[in-house]
């Protein structure tokens, strides 16, 4: 399993994939890029997280997330985790 930094994580999301961090405490969390459509209230793309409970909420990166090099695509874990 190859890990990478936030820049590559963004590229994965721009290609429609989901990413997660090995350092996150909760298993099953991942982030993904949402591109609004005509029905959306949002007008620009944004990143959201799927939480351990399965809730979807907008996501903001912490300093630790930005500098981390333990990002992986969820395909490496056998799909969305």
How should each PLM-predicted stretch be described?
Residues 49-81:
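Short, compact, well-ordered microdomains
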Residues 1-32, 39-44, 48-55, 63:
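Catalytic phosphate/metal-binding cores of nucleic-acid and nucleotide-processing enzymes, i.e., regions
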